[in-house]
A protein has these predicted regions:
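Accessory RNA-recognition modules of RNA-modification enzymes
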Residues: 1-176
């Protein structure tokens, strides 16, 4: 059942960085919405698609990646550093508590950009036989070609180009 243009008040951020609001049948999860925002969303069951931000969170910042919201790798790039760190710390605290562990959590090291040391690049050949390399689009199997990723650690900066070159060599040799 799709409800077009539902007005929602986002209550909190979920574990995957999506905005969460309680609906009549449980939680509704809206990617790219932040806690405290009033949004307009298309709702289908427990999923929402952000259509418009009616009232933005004061914690909202501009995304620093040109692929944000296209590539499926980043969920909370629009959240300012201090609330981002608080959200990440609360995720860790909840996980430890759930496991029955008590531990003091040290402040996070700022890696809200340029800190990712691992990435999975996907590749396939297109209908012309050329390699298409990049990250998967959010909630799909479509590959989004990228030239760079500002979240990668400096030592990983050349990884997209290297992955693309390797995929092209494999495609040229007939490997799939």
């Amino acid at each position: 059942m799709i409800s077009l243009n539902a007005r929602l008040q986002i209550e909190r951020l979920g574990q995957r960085g999506e905005g969460v609001v309680r609906g009549p049948d449980g939680g509704i999860f809206v990617p790219y919405a932040l806690a405290g925002e009033t949004i307009i969303a298309e709702v289908d069951g427990s999923r929402g698609k952000l259509v418009e931000i009616a009232v933005a969170s004061p914690d909202r910042i501009a995304p620093f990646c040109r692929y944000f919201s296209i590539c499926g790798g980043c969920a909370v790039q629009t959240l300012a550093q201090a609330p981002y760190a608080h959200w990440k710390e609360s995720l860790l605290a909840e996980a430890l508590q759930h496991a029955g562990l008590a531990a003091k959590i040290a402040p996070l090291i700022d890696a809200h950009g340029e800190g990712r040391r691992r990435a999975t690049f996907h590749a396939r050949t297109d209908e012309t036989g050329n390699a298409v390399t990049g990250f998967m689009e959010a909630r799909s199997h479509k590959i989004i070609e990228i030239e760079d990723c500002p979240l990668l650690a400096p030592s990983m900066r050349e990884a997209p180009a290297i992955a693309g070159a390797l995929a092209q060599v494999l495609a040229s040799s007939g490997s799939r």
